Amino acid sequence: MVTVPLRWIAIDLEYVRDEMNSKFCVCEIALRCIESNEEIYRTYIQPNENFLVSRRLRQKGITEDDLRQAPTMEEVDRLLKSLLPSFMLVFWNAENDLKHYPNLKAYAYGTRCCMKRYSERYGPYNYDFGDHSFIKLEDAADATGFIMDPEDSYHQASTDAKACAFIWNELNKESLPASISLDLVLRDDVHDLLEAREKTLKLEDKTSDENEIPLPF
């Protein structure tokens, strides 16, 4: 059996609507290594359904031909099935993305939601909701100091995966315990044991001196 290290990967999906405007179809996916900040995979996806390219996508320069000529959902799915078993996938909104692409949870080693993790710490408390309100990716990215490259824009899979990876890393930094100075490492119970040992050694030395037979000269 060959083992491989577990990798933490930020993932983002983008969508188009079908021509009946009744459901979302995945049209783009990007995966980015959280530790190395390296893009692992990104592609447009040819939706299974007849689809509509929204004005927002057209403004980003994405055309219907871009999606028609992209790999099919079946081709991408086969690749991800072989790629994901050693990946812990980190979504911004895991519930939404897994609703539209549930196979990701089955293929991956595990899944995490960055939006929930961030919002539980920084989201304003909503008394009607009974929990912290969810924070938008753009707002969380701005708050944590994420800086986009000139070619980046939100609601592109590569940009959103990059922002998600950055935020997760920042949360990890905050979660690490502060370094402990060496003079604090000695716990009270260890100190007591050492002190008792020192007293025992002194007592043994004293007893040895009292029982010593003096030399005749």
Each predicted region: which residue ranges?
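Acidic two-metal-ion nuclease catalytic site recognized across multiple nuclease folds
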Residues: 2-3, 162-217
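Conserved non-catalytic scaffold segment of RNase H-like nuclease domains
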Residues: 2-109, 137-146
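Short, function-defining helix-loop hinge/capping sites that tune catalysis or transport
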Residues: 20-22, 101, 121-124, 168
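Short alpha-helix plus adjacent loop in nuclease-associated cores
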Residues: 112-132
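Cysteine endopeptidase catalytic domains of the caspase/legumain-like
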Residues: 147-152
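Acidic donor-binding loop at a coil-to-helix junction in glycosyltransferase catalytic cores
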Residues: 159
